[in-house]
Amino acid sequence: MESAVDPSRGFMKDVKRVIIKVGTAVVTREEGRLAVGRLGALCEQIKQLNSLGYDIILVSSGPVGIGRQRLRFRKLINSSFADLQKPQLELDGKACAAVGQNSLMALYDTLFTQLDVTSAQLLVTDNDFRDKDFRKQLTETVKSLLALKVIPVFNENDAVSTRKAPYEDSSGIFWDNDSLSALLALELKADLLVLLSDVEGLYSGPPSDPHSKLIYTYNKEKHQNEITFGDKSRVGRGGMTAKVKAAVHAAEAGIPVVITSGFAPENIINVLQGQRIGTLFHKDAHEWAQVKEVDAREMAVAAGNVREGSRRYLQRKGNKILLKIADALEANEKIIRIENEADVTAAQEAGYEKSLVARLALKPGKIASLANNMRIIANMEDPIGRVLKRTELSDGLILEKTSSPLGVLLIVFESRPDALVQIASLAIRSGNGLLLKGGKEAKRSNAILHKVIIEAIPDNVGGKLIGLVTSREEIPELLKLDDVIDLVIPRGSNKLVSQIKSSTKIPVLGHADGICHVYVDKSANVEMAKRIVLDAKVDYPAACNAMETLLIHKDLIEKGWLKEIILDLRTEGVILYGGPVASSLLNIPQAHSFHHEYSSLACTAEIVDDVYAAIDHINLYGSAHTDSIVAEDNEVANVFLRQVDSAAVFHNASTRFSDGARFETRRRGWN
């Protein structure tokens, strides 16, 4: 679930000097104590960037809040019970700043020292900047520190500052640490200013409002009158309002600014990699083309509304819609192939892995296969309204459990455009609204397939039943739509599935790896075994039901069958890796792990003693997807079928038969 590089942030590759401002809400926890974990992650990022050659300057808030918490505790332990009954006076902020500054810098020094980094403290006031000599000396000092790889840590010297509230006035040089960081960015000629906050960036409204949208690029002409600011930070001076003013000031002077969350441990590094994180302020933003993008939330709401309005029609006519779409796919095969070939060519030129390119390609006959599978689903028994269970609660009172649509589904899928067709057909047949987010490598293929499908949907249902997210919204943003999306189904790598499961409150239905095995028993028909093994590996190597591990009974070595099977695989271009026994016997590289999905013309081979050893191997290293035995001994086959713990277990059949359309079930779209 990695974020892609945003073209509008391509300038990040040229950034050398970065000023990072961290707010009080990031530095401290809710109760006012130091957020040691967050500060540790911040220092680790700064260490990494420092090692990469970046000039890093830190502006840190927090002393007043930290000092207040410490002085309150000190006052509490020195107070009598009678003292505590009296009205409590607010602590002097300047005294709080003096106490807190020491604690904050002590922590920074400790953290940086553990990382073999040296830091330096610089306290300033607004009056200091009225002196030209001060500004010149400040620049020289910082230049010397950066040359020595020292991290300058700035803060306003609140303990002796003479400025009175309100902090912002027309004559002020700066009025808080946000404006201080903007001023320093100009004085020290920074290439980028990063303002870390307790929210992910600038929203169109209060971040707590589910209808507020994160603004990725701030356009003053467009946004300044549209934004509704919520409450200020729980502990800072000005909150988001102050950050926006400081960011606009710096951006207009030519310093790009990004406001982002200080709670995510890798955000600064991700920003510098050009990822679309937080809100960017740039002097040229008003000149960038403003593309009208349909918001994913709007799509999800529209899909839900269409689904509700067309529920009865979909239940009665959903099969006919699928038959019409199947015909449309075949009628538009030529243009679909053209768009898909463009994606494949672009992926090859970009240097994508061969396994990804293989999943991306719609081979000859694939469109016809998708259309035929859609017709199979259309002719299935109606999945909605079926009575699954009936219970008599009392005399004459019957409780029925019936199947019904889930609602609006978000499907996140990688590489494979055929998945779009499979998923759309299942959604229509089951009466669900759909939001699709495909990989950028299949952009053109997904777009044409989506267009063909929605144009075949009758007007009284509407194409909004199935939405394709083509905006630059990243998956993390989609996973926040828990109020309008009912289920997330990820189809892709184990990494994608795991990341989605840990990143959303929406229920997730997803599988992990497709580590499928074929075990060839000593009783196998060798010709049948060779055909099954070749089909399982070579037919579609990138499929999740392709064979990844070949297990062979030890007795087949003496019979010479092992060499025949291996020779056939090599003839088809399959790269072989071995377990401890097979690698030595066949003189092939040893596999680094038995739990590995190649998704290409490669597989692992290993020798086992008997069917029980094969079963133990599969249950230990497999992914519970699909596993097959090739055997003429029915007793051995039945042991395998009963004891292998997988979703599909076959006897004398290729793992490639593990397909929902062939099973005439709905599961294919979700696998």
Swiss-Prot record:
Q: Where is this region: Glutamate 5-kinase?
A: 1-297
Query: Which UniProt keywords are present, listed alphabetically?
Result: Amino-acid biosynthesis, ATP-binding, Kinase, Multifunctional enzyme, NADP, Nucleotide-binding, Oxidoreductase, Proline biosynthesis, Transferase
* One GO term (biological process): L-proline biosynthetic process
Documented EC number(s):
2.7.2.11, 1.2.1.41
Q: Name one Pfam family in it.
A: AA_kinase
Stored Gene3D superfamilies? Acetylglutamate kinase-like, Aldehyde Dehydrogenase, Chain A, domain 1, Aldehyde Dehydrogenase, Chain A, domain 2
Q: Which InterPro entries match?
A: AceGlu_kinase-like_sf, Ald_DH/histidinol_DH, Ald_DH_C, Ald_DH_N, Asp/Glu/Uridylate_kinase, G-glutamylP_reductase_CS, Glu/AcGlu_kinase, Glu_5kinase/COase_Synthase
Which positions in this protein are listed as binding substrate?
61, 158, 177
Which portions of the sequence form the region Gamma-glutamyl phosphate reductase? 298-671
Describe which pathway this protein belongs to, using the record's wording: Amino-acid biosynthesis; L-proline biosynthesis; L-glutamate 5-semialdehyde from L-glutamate: step 1/2; Amino-acid biosynthesis; L-proline biosynthesis; L-glutamate 5-semialdehyde from L-glutamate: step 2/2
Here the disulfide bonds are: none
Annotated catalysed reactions: L-glutamate + ATP = L-glutamyl 5-phosphate + ADP; L-glutamate 5-semialdehyde + phosphate + NADP(+) = L-glutamyl 5-phosphate + NADPH + H(+)
Q: Which domain of life is it from?
A: Eukaryota
Q: In which tissues is it expressed?
A: Expressed at high levels in leaves and is inducible in roots subjected to salt stress.
* GO terms for cellular component: cytoplasm
Extract the GO molecular function terms from the UniProt entry.
ATP binding; glutamate 5-kinase activity; glutamate-5-semialdehyde dehydrogenase activity
Tell me what controls its activity. Answer: Feedback regulated by proline.
Instruction: Please give the function described in this protein's UniProt entry.
Output: P5CS plays a key role in proline biosynthesis, leading to osmoregulation in plants.
Q: Which family does it belong to?
A: In the N-terminal section; belongs to the glutamate 5-kinase family. In the C-terminal section; belongs to the gamma-glutamyl phosphate reductase family.
Per its record, how is this protein called by name?
Delta-1-pyrroline-5-carboxylate synthase
Protein species of origin: Vigna aconitifolia
